From Swiss-Prot:
Keyword Transcription regulation: yes
Species this chain originates from: Xylella fastidiosa (strain Temecula1 / ATCC 700964)
Functional description taken from the UniProt entry: Participates in transcription elongation, termination and antitermination.
Name of the protein this chain belongs to: Transcription termination/antitermination protein NusG
Annotated KOW domain residues: 134-162
Length: 185
């Protein structure tokens, strides 16, 4: 049975470590003992210079998840030496997280499911980089109310929209705006 293990990699090199692991696994032809290699991340949307930009936000910077064939020895999960050495000797890998240096332990199935669900949700619906709350002051940076300040009244994360009370002629007027049209003031 394959279980998920957490590998500590140099921060900023998670993707290259994941690719190096995939390459090494296929070069040695032991794909049957490995499953997915994953850098848990989600897509976030932010406004920069008036443009909507999509970027990636890693859930666990400096860590890579890898599925490895696991057997049980005295009720304790173990991986074979060849798999251990393949991961441990990959450039920019510092080691496994959990267990001991030479006997890593997998994360629980529940933890793995939560992480995989978050990755799936992030891929299906990019979330805004900045989160808003009712009662918070914001500045409109795009559209007909550009440069107006307002107070957040409602937040709709499903549609990435806000209802903001903007002062127009000295009166608060509710205006519906996209997350990308405002910034925290």
């Amino acid at each position: 049975m394959k279980r998920w293990y957490v590998v500590h990699a140099y921060s900023g090199f998670e993707k290259s470590v994941a690719q190096a692991l995939r390459d090494r696994i296929s070069r040695i032809e032991i794909q049957d003992r490995f499953g997915d290699v994953l850098v848990p991340a989600e897509e976030v949307v932010e406004m920069r210079s008036g443009q909507k930009r999509r970027s990636e936000h890693k859930f666990f910077p400096g860590y890579v998840l890898i599925q490895i064939e696991t057997y049980y020895e005295g009720g304790v999960p173990r991986i074979d030496n060849e798999c251990w050495h393949l991961v441990k000797e990959t450039p920019k890998v510092m080691g496994f997280i959990g267990g001991t240096a030479d006997r890593p332990l997998p994360i629980s199935s529940d933890e793995a499911d939560v992480i995989l669900r978050r990755v799936q949700d992030g891929a299906e619906k990019p979330r805004p980089k900045v989160l808003f709350e009712p009662g918070q002051m914001v500045r409109v940076i795009d559209g007909p109310f550009n440069d107006f300040d307002g107070l957040v009244e409602e937040v709709n994360y499903e549609k990435n929209r806000l209802r903001v009370a903007v002062l127009i002629f000295g009166r608060p007027t509710p205006v519906d705006l996209d997350f990308g049209q405002v910034q925290k003031s």
